[in-house]
């Protein structure tokens, strides 16, 4: 087994290989039977001695004290071959036979019988396991054989003497398996030796010492039969017995030969593992010896590959050959032959050197003293270069290496003083004779460090810029200087202890000194020629002397080997002691690793597991003593507390305690986890785990689904892996009773492979504890890793895989070993591991240009399974790569800075661990960028700061306006230290379609307002708070002014009333410090709440009647009327008649009674929003009753009657389950297939048009060289997954033209044929509406373009094949694609990158950050939607210039140039637009709806009356279960999909007033009850009735040159199922409605205020994104407003009183809203509920109210 490990695991290190070989004890003596006690059970070597004084009888016997003693006893049990011998064949008490082993028989009593038959024994005793023989018959072994006489050899005599007194011999054990026969034979031979039969056993040469007698043969035959049953004999033994059933001697002879062969193999392995070579013997002899051993092992089936052989050879090299271990150890593909070429070269060079230097002989003490220990470090070797080559020898690089990584033998301290004998050294150069002296080595105070070093000398290095020395005895004026950065030739750091002076006293009494650095981590003392040159000393290699510039000789140079040396006798020793210099600076290698760093490095494992792993060497590279465990006891990891939070510990011992014992990898546990929701399609949603019962080794595999074929693929993979890697067969797999395990496909697979499935019993979760606990552990680790690193959630499986790698390497406290050790694998080298999410820079091997940056920021995930690289996530490329070309980003611990880790810095620790893996960027070459803005992956995305805020002190407590108390004392806010972090990209919640892309500023402290009354939404009570609350306290350009100006003029930086105030620091954003706010009075505090507006003029107030605004009454209040009017002016709000002040009744008095079904309401319900409709009138008008008109189902049913059929099975559909199952609305197929358009088309005219369109498309494909026309491929030659199905689709466009398109079936495209990270971007609808609105306000020309066959301009990178078009008639052939065909997954992304590059480089455009497909320059704005382009410009010639540039590359059609001054009609992305420049714009879809709705087969106008509203209040969807036939259910679901799909298209384009009804019905697509269908028909009927309505825009006429962006928000509390609230927002730009949103809140709100806060917080991110877009497209200043009808929400936003926060989530949401309002300069305004047009987005309204809120913008 040990020898097999060398071949099965070639990656095991030297130490592991040596340990696996030497663990087997092998003796080299000639006796083949002298086997180790580790393999043979220990028998009583003194045998069982009978007491000569003791007499026993069969009836009674004394029980001996020695348990090996035995006494006879009658027995009645069957012979031993019929059952196992208990207790290792020890005879039980009272079974001893006084006559020894005589019962084995005599030839006269037991005839020879065939071996296969049971021998005839005497009747056995009543309790004996052996036949009972007469006691008078003596043992044939008691006397010498007459044939042998006294002719025994000495060895046999010794055996005979040793066993002559053995009256009772312990029998061998029973043979129970053919595999155990070799070991059993050894014990059987030992048994024969103890029975005085050692002479008949064959010796090494195969011949016995003496002949065997008949009695001995009988004894041999019978004992062999008894203890080796025939059914357990190997085949080769049976073959021998089939020829001669008595030839036991031949069996023994063959067995001994096999033992000798095994011994030779073991000896060869031991010899190979303990090779030693230093050049004392010829290299040829050494090579012959090694190759013979390797050939012998290979011939015996023990394969020694090149890697293992080279490692073992290099491990034994010493002397001048030792450096091969350091120059060759990184060569992965080196062969034994190449290694021996290097050995031969050194040997020949050594021999030549000895011949040229006959008088020199190296001092043997050099090698004796070459035993030193060094600190454990990973610093690499130091390269020293000589400046000049000699005439007859090559100048080599000095083989100086880092001793800390190469020499692990015990030794003295680095600076210990040892004496060495002086020795004459003959100089190699003839010029040395001119010195007139004989060079002798002085007594040196330094121990030798390397075999090829010249003791007592300094190596002259022309490449070293600094002098380095290991000994402390020559350093003068030593001082600590740890900041010095010294690197070796590979640019790796060398730790420096101290810096000082090195003083020389040369032979001409010249004294000089140079700077020297002290370090014990080098192999040679290096003397820098550069530093000598600085003091006017040069090295002359022609004379081999050090000399001055005037020619004065200072010291001789000695050439030893290939290097030049100067003696240390010229150095002046210092008086500093060794401990002093060693304590000057602690070496980096001696500093212990902090426990928090190791805890994070090892996947947040606990301290006990880590210590066990280090003690048992399952984690290599450093020891337990290298870690600082002082903080491990009370250390609490915040990430662990968050990620591993659990209720209680799992019950221990839940697995079955009486399972059978299995060999490694025979019994597996498996379980599936998932799904993980809200992930990209490319990310796995599940994982399946496997755990081995014996070794606890774990595997995890990702899954995208739980289909049978996916599970079967994983099972096939792991079974093949275990079989090939571990030579084991899985016997049992334990799993739960999930359908993925109990399906027929998997069951047949397991049955075919002979695997027993072991299912858990019903409701017995404890029986599956191994797999469940593993999944829980991995998920804990996953959450912790993601929390700590801040990486997006779609990388969750990478965290699982990282945890699995680490967990397999951690030791179990029970077994003291890791799973890898149990499996026979090497330990995990922690130096190859990086913390999960560690920021790195990856080398870009294929940059876009020569000046493009070569580094890409990324985040390390886990080591690669398939290479020596690391898996790294690159956010900018949106993919992961497997590479070794990376460098760790210094000073970036990902998100560690978010928690208080006691200011730990792990950079140095990480550098020490990964020093050998720093690949291509030196630390001094890394430049950090301050620009952390990363281009968004989504339309709207931001990095939302999640840092917990420090507690803030209130600046001043506000008092009532009439209070005249002096201003309160201000308290300082805690100062924040800004720290720039490279943050991992955060995921955007898929439930939120808009989020901020701009960095938001921190909220600054604001004054607190007292005496605030809080009311519900649409409040009925008077509120003494400012209803206009801009929270935008500027953090920049603030200054104090002496004059007290009361006007605020528009400017980027505005002034305030600030004079004679004490400045108090407040927290700032973006790292800005020392920002102050003035100390203000209470009255001024209230004023500033209204006046802090950066962009709105204000004037003194005149009245307070406008728009029911209730301002705060202060003496010097600047009027907020103009400010508020600038927000609300020009908004399409309803006009209400003025009402006289009346006292409102109790708001709860007029509410309708609570309906028990209101919580299930989808289209209506109670709410405060309808209260005002019932106050003045208790009767509903006739117009209100019109909404009760229902579409008759009878008309529709008569068209769809089916003939009578047998009863069918019905399906039950539950409302809540159906609502939850709805994910998205499937698009309606509006195209025709080839057979529909041409083959079976009965309309001849239409068919001809489609045929023409078909040929036109084919010609275009050929023109664009879409595929390779030079070769057609056979289908059998191509990988099926690279073959893409294709088809022709046909369509009739709205202008009447017929279109054909050749497309690929991307819906069934294999994932390996495209990059899932690539995205096909199109212009967002909000971006288009914003551009259209700005075009109207700025008199822009609008030009519409179309690029024909746009996708075909983009090349395709992947190797893909399609079937030729049908007209070619080549169904069995394939053609290779060259262009991005429509329908391919990557075509959209390829085209986007192509056109984007062209617009930027050739047209001079730039893409707006955060808004894909929106490009601009100083004159033109372009909105791109696939092949459609919309150009906006004030100068039509600028548009024409862009068109000319586009036509140079693409087939560009001008759909509408837009040059007319009259009304121009456009059809832009489905919108029918009427535009008259400088006047108005109308957006509708009348023509499209007139064409599409009749095709839906919906009965229109059944009663001849028009609906005036899409729904009615108070109507609830019945939640009773729906029971339908399967076919009927599918048909109705399909119909719902078509109807809601069309309604959604219309609603999100321009009919924002219908979004509430569309959103509600979309949730019931899978619940097509009669009621739901009727409501859907009503909605379609209303769309049909109002198809001529348009979204009307008029050109705004602002008083000031600003853009005004406003969002109106509303929420309906608890009117959805499960008490969810409906929220809605409407966005307006310069008074024009550009978008709307209606959705169900993702959380359950507990109050109306909380629902309103949730609605506002949902609207702010998109508002900020639109603000950024408007500022990019139009450089005018922008004012942002937020309107709501909830006074309580406004009071929370403007207040600093955190006591209003009822719970943590509510408070967090409100606090975040405060920050967003403050940081984004939002003006919060109150709007009456009657005027809140967002009310239509949250609830069904009566006809009158619906019309009142919509007639100003939809008509």
Swiss-Prot record:
Keyword Plastid: no
Biased composition (Low complexity): 153-165, 402-418, 960-969
Major subcellular site: cytoplasm
Short motif (Bipartite nuclear localization signal): ranges: 1178-1212
Active-site annotation: 461 (for protease activity)
Post-translational modification comment from the UniProt entry: Initially, virus-like particles (VLPs) are composed of the structural unprocessed proteins Gag and Gag-Pol, and also contain the host initiator methionine tRNA (tRNA(i)-Met) which serves as a primer for minus-strand DNA synthesis, and a dimer of genomic Ty RNA. Processing of the polyproteins occurs within the particle and proceeds by an ordered pathway, called maturation. First, the protease (PR) is released by autocatalytic cleavage of the Gag-Pol polyprotein yielding capsid protein p45 and a Pol-p154 precursor protein.
Site (Cleavage): 401-402, 582-583, 1217-1218
Domain Integrase catalytic stretches: 660-835
GO BP, sorted A to Z: DNA integration; DNA recombination; proteolysis; transposition; viral translational frameshifting
Record protein name field: Transposon Ty1-MR2 Gag-Pol polyprotein
Source species taxonomy: Eukaryota, Fungi, Dikarya, Ascomycota, Saccharomycotina
Name of encoding gene: TY1B-MR2
